[in-house]
Amino acid sequence: MYAIIRDRGMQYRVEPGQVLTIDLISAEPGSQIELGEVLLVGDAEQVKVGSPLVEGAVVRAEVLGEQKGDKIVVFRYRNKTRYRRRTGHRQRYTKIRISEIVA
C-alpha cells in the first residue's frame, strides 16, 4: 500500500516502513505523529483519489530525530565599492519513519 501526502506545500509518496526527511516539526524523537492531508491512497487492486483529500485517510509516523541540511552560502557583491557580504544558512529537517497508512 502507498499514499501521496501533502505536508506544508510539499508532496511525498510514502509506504509503510519508509524513512522520510521533512521540514522541521516540533515533536520529540520517539513520538508518534499523524499526517492528515492524504491526497491519494493505492494498492495493487485499487486507487482512491481525493478531491482534494481522501476522506478518513491518515498516515501515522514515528519521529526519529532532527538533522541539518547542507550549508547554503549567500554572497552579495557590488563592484567598484568594496561591498561584500557573506552569510550562510543550514535548513533544519525532521526524520520520520512511516508506521501505517489507514484508509
UniProtKB/Swiss-Prot annotation:
Name the UniProt key words of this record, in alphabetical order: Ribonucleoprotein, Ribosomal protein, RNA-binding, rRNA-binding
Q: Does the keyword Acetylation apply?
A: no
Q: Which InterPro entries match?
A: bL21-like (IPR028909), bL21-like_sf (IPR036164), Ribosomal_bL21 (IPR001787), Ribosomal_bL21_CS (IPR018258)
GO molecular function annotations of the record: rRNA binding; structural constituent of ribosome
List, alphabetically, the GO terms of the cellular component aspect: cytoplasm; ribonucleoprotein complex; ribosome
* Cystine residue pairs: none
Query: Which BP terms in the Gene Ontology apply to this protein?
Result: translation
What Pfam families does UniProt report for this protein, alphabetically?
Answer: Ribosomal_L21p (PF00829)
Q: Which family does it belong to?
A: Belongs to the bacterial ribosomal protein bL21 family.
Q: What does this protein do?
A: This protein binds to 23S rRNA in the presence of protein L20.
- Summarize subunit and interaction data from the UniProt record for this chain: Part of the 50S ribosomal subunit. Contacts protein L20.
What is the protein name stated in its UniProt record? Large ribosomal subunit protein bL21
Taxonomic lineage: Bacteria, Bacillati, Chloroflexota, Chloroflexia, Chloroflexales
Gene coding for it: rplU
